[in-house]
Amino acid sequence: MKTDANRWFPRSFTLFILTVLFVLLASPAFASGYDNALKGVTKYNALFEFSQGDPKMANLIFWAVRNSYQVDEVKSLKEKPNVVVVFHGPAVKLISSDKSPFNAAQSAEVDKFQDTIRQMKKEGVRFEVCLYAAKVVGVDEKTIMPEIDRVGNGFVSVIGYQMQGYAVVRIP
């Protein structure tokens, strides 16, 4: 037979466990996991060398690219994050107004991708496209989004930013 004391114990114990879990999970030590990676870091200079031509995959990847400079730990660094994306290869088709290489579903993904680029540009991200790559994949320079700076050879940009201290993340 259950008494009031028997009913009280399981509820209070459960409440205690939930409180402890909440405190532990809300603790900064458990929140990020970036303590080792950002130890001593004062600035965030990142260059993403992007060649991925699949629109759906590009959207998934760009969520992570965008999130990388939006996390609180990066935003709280002494210097504002500097992010550059250089487009090469098949990725150049994703930044063109010519959607003929894509079916309807892919075209919708391209529109979403281009909207993300516009938003990231407003957030201060710089974009460059390799015009040699555009020529190789058959993209007319005139169809490239106006938010994206044109460079003759994207490798020169990648090397230049790397020499300036940017971390290079290659996304094939």
Language-model regions, residue ranges each:
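N-terminal secretory signal peptides that target proteins for export/translocation
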Residues: M1-P10
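Short stretches within intrinsically disordered, low-complexity N-terminal or propeptide regions
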Residues: R7, P28-A31
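Bacterial N-terminal signal peptides
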Residues: S12-A26
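Secreted/extracellular ectodomain signature
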Residues: F30-P172
